[in-house]
C-alpha cells in the first residue's frame, strides 16, 4: 500500500501544465455539453405531449440524473484539477459529492436494466405492455430505482466502503484497496452483474425478433370446397380471412355464420400494429445504444478498479487511469446525441419545437370593425 501511494505521488509530481490544460478543457466541454444537451432533451420531453408515454418517462429520468451529476459533481473535479489535484472542501463535502456521483452511476445502471425489461415487454408482450405500463407504473419504477440507488450509495457515507478523495482520479469516490481488506468489492460486483443482466435481456430480445423474422417453408394441405369458401378440415383459413376483410363474394361460409363482415377497419388495424412494432424496435435500438455506450465508457474504469483490488504488483498506469476516469465523465453527455441521431420521433419533435421558437411573428394589421 505504501509503494502504491509513493508511485502515485511520483506520477502527480510529473503532471505537466499541458496535461492539466487538456484535463480542464475536456472536462469543461463535457460539463457544458452534458448540462445543455440533457436540459434541452428534458424540456422537449416535458413540453411535447406526444412524448408523454412509457419509454420517454424513463429517458427524462436519465436526463435528470445526468444533469445532477454534471452540474454538481463535475465542478468539484474541475476545481480539484485546477488546484493541483488537491481537495480543499472538507471531509463531509467529499462524502456528499462521492455519494451523489455513485448514486448517479448506480441509478443509470438500474434504470437501463428496467428499460431493457420494458423494451422486451413492448415487443414480446405488446398488449400487456400497453395496458399495464401507465404513468403511475412508470412513476413506481422510477421511485424503486432511486430507492435502490440510494441503498447502494449511502452505506459508504457511514464508512462501509469508505469514500475518500483519490488524487490519481481528481475526485471523491470509493477507496479501492486490496481484496483481503476491501469493502468496496461487493459494490463493483453488483454493478457488473447489473450490466451483464441488461445485456442478457437485450440478447433475449434480439433472439425473439430474429425468430419471428425467420421464414419457414409453407406446408400446403389440400382443402375441399363446393362453393369456393374452402372451410373445414384442410383449409388454411385464408378464404375466411378474405371474406371477413370484405373481399369475399357470395353466401356466408357455414363456419362464419353470425360473424359480421368488416370491409375497411381490419387492414387499417394491421398496418397500425406494424407501425407500432417498427416504432418500438427503433426505441429499443436507441436504448440499447445508450446501454452499450454506458458499458463501453465505464468499462475501462471498472477494469482499473478491479486491477487495484486484485493486482499485487504494478499499479494502474497513470495515463490509462486518467483516460478511464474521463471516459466515465463523458458518459453523462453522450445520451442527448444518441437521442437525436437514433430516434426519428425525437428528431422530428425537436426540429418542430426549434422552428416554432425561431419563427418570427408577423405584425398585426390595423383594422376596424364595421
Swiss-Prot record:
Gene3D superfamilies: Rhodopsin 7-helix transmembrane proteins. Interacts with DLG4 and DLG3. Signal peptide: none annotated. Keywords: Cell membrane, Disulfide bond, Endoplasmic reticulum, G-protein coupled receptor, Glycoprotein, Membrane, Receptor, Transducer, Transmembrane, Transmembrane helix. It is found in: Cell membrane; Endoplasmic reticulum. This is Probable G-protein coupled receptor 85. Its main location: membrane. Pfam families: 7tm_1. It comes from Pongo abelii (Sumatran orangutan).
Amino acid at each position: 500500500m505504501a509503494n502504491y501511494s509513493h508511485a502515485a505521488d511520483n506520477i502527480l509530481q510529473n503532471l505537466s501544465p499541458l496535461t492539466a490544460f487538456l484535463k480542464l478543457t475536456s472536462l469543461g466541454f463535457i460539463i457544458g455539453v452534458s448540462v445543455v444537451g440533457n436540459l434541452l432533451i428534458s424540456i422537449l420531453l416535458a413540453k411535447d405531449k406526444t412524448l408523454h408515454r412509457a419509454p420517454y418517462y424513463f429517458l427524462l429520468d436519465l436526463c435528470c440524473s445526468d444533469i445532477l451529476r454534471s452540474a454538481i459533481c463535475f465542478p468539484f473535479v474541475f476545481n480539484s484539477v485546477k488546484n493541483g489535484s488537491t481537495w480543499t472542501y472538507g471531509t463531509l463535502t467529499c462524502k456528499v459529492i462521492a455519494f451523489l456521483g455513485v448514486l448517479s452511476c448506480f441509478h443509470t445502471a438500474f434504470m437501463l436494466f428496467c428499460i431493457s425489461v420494458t423494451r422486451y415487454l413492448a415487443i414480446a408482450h405488446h398488449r400487456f405492455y400497453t395496458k399495464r405500463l401507465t404513468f403511475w407504473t412508470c412513476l413506481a419504477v422510477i421511485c424503486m430505482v432511486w430507492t435502490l440507488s440510494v441503498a447502494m450509495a449511502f452505506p459508504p457515507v457511514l464508512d462501509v466502503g469508505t469514500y475518500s478523495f483519490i488524487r490519481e482520479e481528481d475526485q471523491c469516490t470509493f477507496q479501492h484497496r486490496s481484496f483481503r481488506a476491501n469493502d468496496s468489492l461487493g459494490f463493483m460486483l453488483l454493478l457488473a452483474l447489473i450490466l451483464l443482466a441488461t445485456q442478457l435481456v437485450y440478447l433475449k430480445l434480439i433472439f425473439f425478433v430474429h425468430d419471428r423474422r425467420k421464414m419457414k417453408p409453407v406446408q400446403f394441405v389440400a382443402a375441399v370446397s363446393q362453393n369456393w369458401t374452402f372451410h373445414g378440415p384442410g383449409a388454411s383459413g385464408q378464404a375466411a380471412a378474405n371474406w371477413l376483410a370484405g373481399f369475399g363474394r357470395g353466401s356466408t361460409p357455414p363456419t362464419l355464420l353470425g360473424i359480421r363482415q368488416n370491409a375497411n377497419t381490419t387492414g387499417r388495424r394491421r398496418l397500425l400494429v406494424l407501425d407500432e412494432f417498427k416504432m418500438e424496435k427503433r426505441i429499443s435500438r436507441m436504448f440499447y445504444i445508450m446501454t452499450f455506450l454506458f458499458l463501453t465508457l465505464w468499462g475501462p474504469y471498472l477494469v482499473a478498479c478491479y486491477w487495484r483490488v486484485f493486482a499485487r504488483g504494478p499499479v494502474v498506469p497513470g495515463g490509462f487511469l486518467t483516460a478511464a476516469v474521463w471516459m466515465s465523465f463523458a458518459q453523462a453527455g453522450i445520451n442527448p446525441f444518441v437521442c437525436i441521431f437514433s430516434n426519428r420521433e425525437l428528431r422530428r419533435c425537436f426540429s418542430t419545437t426549434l422552428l416554432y421558437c425561431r419563427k418570427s411573428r408577423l405584425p398585426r394589421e390595423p383594422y376596424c370593425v364595421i
